[in-house]
A protein has these predicted regions:
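A short glycine-rich, Lys/Arg-flanked "PGG" loop and its adjoining helix->strand segment in the class I
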Residues: 130-142
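A short acidic, Gly/Pro-enriched loop at the edge of an enzyme's catalytic core
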Residues: 105-116
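Short alpha-helix
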Residues: 175-189
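Conserved Class I S-adenosyl-L-methionine
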Residues: 194-253
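Class I SAM-dependent methyltransferase SAM/SAH-binding core
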Residues: 50-52, 56-106
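Conserved class I S-adenosyl-L-methionine
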Residues: 1-43, 58-62, 81-84, 147-169, 207-210
Length: 253
């Protein structure tokens, strides 16, 4: 895999997504899920928090607004959106919130910078996931925590229909990971699972970006496809995906 080419595909794909703000919000926003995350991550005064793959700041802004005694930094590869986020944070008077762009590979922070790293609906786009989780571990303090929220394949989907489906839009999708896969990857980087919950997302996709949709359906078992409650309208496709929400803690030094 050409890692830099994959990152560029993701950057371009999300530039397009962020430009279609209303549809992007339909894909990603879920008030109930957000409130559950905010209660689950246990933010405390004085924390330094990194929102990895922050996008338009869906986690960054409410975390900063609810926890003025914390420093929150959003990190993303889409520099234009980072600029928009900075302006919004300034307009909102959130002096504890800042945004940083990076190359999608190495985090621009020192060892042990953060108490908490959060990431939502982003890691399935990271082409070298072991390196990225290693970077998370590097910038976390000993005893710090990582919160991952990302969709996962259904148990019956051993051939990964869902990944083929998500790759229909050329935005750098790599794969959805199972909870066990996350445990294995994170454990190798000194991060141990401490708590989790599962949620769901009803994900819309524009048909005019779903290149090869019919071919993907032909290549997978009908029962597996039906397990995702896939529905087709005149202009859109809708799929229900399970979401892993997992909390890890970094080993003490």
């Amino acid at each position: 895999m050409d890692i830099r080419a994959s990152i560029e595909d993701t950057r371009k794909g999300f530039e397009e997504s962020f430009a279609s703000e209303e549809f992007y919000n339909r894909q990603t926003q879920d008030a109930e899920h957000l409130e559950r995350i905010l209660a689950f991550i246990n933010v405390r005064d004085g924390m330094r928090i990194l929102d990895l793959g922050c996008g338009s700041g869906y986690l960054s802004f409410p975390i900063a607004e609810k926890n003025l005694g914390c420093e929150v930094i959003g990190l993303d590869i889409v520099s234009d959106t980072i600029g928009v986020n900075r302006s919004k944070a300034q307009e909102a008077g959130l002096s504890n919130l800042s945004f940083v762009s990076y190359d999608g590979i190495d985090f621009p922070f020192e060892v042990g910078t953060f108490d908490l790293v959060v990431t939502r609906y982003a890691l399935h786009h990271f082409p070298d996931i072991k390196h990225s989780i290693g970077e998370v571990s590097r910038v976390l303090k000993a005893g710090g925590t990582l919160f991952i929220s990302d969709p996962c394949p259904n148990d019956c989907d051993t051939e990964r229909f869902v990944d083929d489906y998500m790759r229909l839009k050329k935005d750098g999708h790599i794969k959805f990971y199972t909870k066990t896969e996350w445990q294995d990857i994170c454990s190798e980087c000194g991060l141990q699972l401490t708590d989790s919950f599962e949620s769901k997302i009803r994900f819309p996709k524009k048909k005019d970006t779903a290149y090869g949709y019919k071919e993907v359906l032909k290549n997978h078992d009908k029962a597996v496809i039906e397990s995702y409650d896939l529905v087709e309208t005149d202009t859109e496709l809708h799929i229900t995906e399970r979401v892993n929400n997992i909390l890890f803690i970094k080993d003490e030094a």
